[in-house]
From Swiss-Prot:
FAD-containing subunit of the ArdAB flavocytochrome c, which catalyzes the reduction of acrylate to propanoate and supports dimethylsulfoniopropionate-dependent anaerobic respiration. In vitro, can use the artificial electron donor methyl viologen. The natural electron donor is probably a low-potential cytochrome c. Also shows weak activity toward methacrylate in vitro (at a 22-fold lower rate) but cannot use other tested 2-enoates, including crotonic, fumaric, sorbic, urocanic, cinnamic, p-coumaric, caffeic or ferulic acids. Keywords: FAD, Flavoprotein, Oxidoreductase, Periplasm, Signal. This is Acrylate reductase flavoprotein subunit. GO terms for cellular component: periplasmic space.
Length: 506
């Protein structure tokens, strides 16, 4: 079975460029109103807020299920949201490429890996629902024209290699084909259209929204207010709040403006806040994830992140103060980020650790050329030159490399228990490529609570709020304490597809 047809059915389009917390939000807040006496400016069948993975998948699925009048509203000037600049990594179990590579995997195995990272508070039912439908979502991207590297990656916390990555190494390799597919299907797409609140019926159900058309992100009060009736309901796919400094500091005071962030500017959380005001259950808001693959030498997600993600399995992370490894390079994100933050100099100041890789192995990833070209990575012909450049004690470093290369030979890491499968035959040897590591805020595990129908739950009754669905990072509680890398895209897409299906059945 080919990489193009995961389900037995039948190119890339170039990329682009809790209630208490509500009061602290930086963005201007929306206010919901009652539908009695409302003069509707327009009426649509399916109304979707947000144009990332979740919103685009919902629109395509709604159309496939018979919807004739589907509208996507995006507050920014460009479509794709934060999804367009993510790493383009998609995890799915029991795929054709796994069979080709001899990787044994299953829904149960993928769920077990995620539950371990969730540290006891992840939502198993939602994780299982996503895993069961992940291949179907992956097929949607392939049908739309997404292209992936012809190999799988084993990301941190995953027990096997199950991750696809777009050939452009970013989410635009998925969002742009999905956006084009939406337009082919007749989905109406509106940018510079900001959500400004829900419109409710007499029972508190969602029957429409207020929007501001002609909105400019740098002018919070801009745009013309319009009221739009949604016959089948509203799907909120508005993303997380990692760029809302006040909100994230309310959850974790250490996440100040000085802490880097990989997210797009629009990840400010207004949609989530308004659902809280409506009565949605807030879940796990304090669990905000930092990416351990980020670099202090570039802004945002940059080039190093995908470089590191690819190379972690066959590289060593070194504490520059000691010259020794300090973590399992493919542990889950929280474990690694916490370990990196403990790397300090003798005075207790941050001392970003380094990731050392054999150039012969690192060059297999296209970002290697970019990290070297833009001086956010370095190439050395000897370990002596490397140690001198980063002021790392030479003797301990040489000893550590020799010990690690023995682990590669024996396929066993007694030091940190790293799974050495993907490191087989890949020794740490000259020439070397090196990048510096330091975590950046990347993902919000918290948001509104949903069920496996993507329905938003009411905090008083525990029942779904009529007419309201949510999918993607705006939802909370799914992953628990820590989300595994490459599990966000399948979650967003599967829950967006689910919301559309349930809405069309209602």
């Amino acid at each position: 079975m080919s990489n193009k047809d995961l389900l037995g059915r039948r190119n890339f389009i170039k990329g682009m460029g809790a209630a208490a917390g509500v009061a602290m939000a930086a963005p201007a807040l929306a206010v919901s109103e009652n539908a009695n006496g409302v003069k509707w400016d327009k009426e649509v069948e399916v109304l979707i807020i947000g144009s990332g993975f979740a919103g685009l998948a919902a629109a395509i699925e709604a159309t496939r299920k018979g919807a004739k009048d589907v509208h996507i509203f995006e507050k920014m000037s460009y479509f794709g949201g934060n999804s367009a600049i993510n790493g383009g990594l998609f995890a799915a179990p029991d795929t054709p490429m796994q069979k080709q590579e001899g990787v044994k995997d299953s829904v149960d195995t993928m769920v077990a890996d995620q539950l371990a990272a969730g540290r006891g508070i992840a939502d198993e039912a939602l994780l299982r629902h996503v895993a069961e439908h992940a291949v179907e979502a992956l097929q949607m991207t392939l049908d739309a024209g997404s292209e992936y590297h012809p190999y799988l990656q084993q990301l941190g916390g995953h027990s096997v290699a199950r991750t696809y990555q777009t050939t452009v190494s970013c989410g635009a390799g998925i969002t742009q084909p999905l956006l084009q597919e939406c337009r082919k299907l007749g989905v109406h797409t509106h940018n510079r259209a900001k959500f400004d609140g829900f419109i409710l019926d007499e029972k508190g159900g969602v029957v429409g929204v207020k929007m501001r058309e002609g909105y400019y992100f740098d002018k919070p009060e801009s745009g013309k207010l319009v009221r739009i009736k949604a016959r089948r309901g509203v799907i909120m796919a508005t993303g997380g709040f990692a760029q809302n400094i006040n909100m994230r500091m309310a959850q974790d005071p250490t996440l100040t403006a000085e802490v880097g962030c990989t997210n797009a500017p629009g990840a400010t959380g207004e949609g989530m806040f308004e659902m809280f005001r409506l009565g949605a259950v807030p879940v796990h808001l304090a669990h905000i994830q930092s990416g351990p693959w980020a670099s202090p030498d570039e802004g945002g997600f940059g080039y190093v992140s995908n470089y590191s993600i690819y190379n972690f399995p066959h590289s060593i992370a070194i504490d520059r103060l000691t010259g020794k490894r300090f973590m399992n390079e493919i542990a889950d994100r929280k474990t690694r980020a916490d370990a990196e933050l403990n790397c300090r100099d003798a005075q207790g100041n941050p001392l970003p650790p380094i990731l050392i890789t054999s150039y012969e192995d690192s060059k297999q990833h296209p970002n290697t050329k970019k990290v070297l070209k833009y001086n956010v990575g370095w190439k050395f012909d000897s370990i002596d030159a490397l140690a001198k450049h980063f002021d790392v004690p030479l003797a301990p470093l040489k000893k550590q490399i020799a010990e690690y290369n023995d682990y590669v030979k024996t396929q066993s890491d007694p030091q940190f228990g790293k799974n050495m499968t993907e490191a087989k035959g890949k020794f740490i040897q000259a020439p070397f490529t090196v990048v510096r590591l330091w975590p950046k805020v990347h993902y919000c595990q918290g948001g509104v609570q949903i069920n496996t129908n993507a329905e938003v739950k009411d905090s008083l009754t525990g029942k779904p709020i009529s007419g309201l669905y949510a999918a993607g990072e705006v939802c909370g509680g799914i992953h628990g304490v820590s989300r595994l890398g490459s599990c966000s895209i399948p979650e967003c897409m599967v829950m967006g597809m689910t919301a559309a299906r349930i809405m069309m059945q209602a």
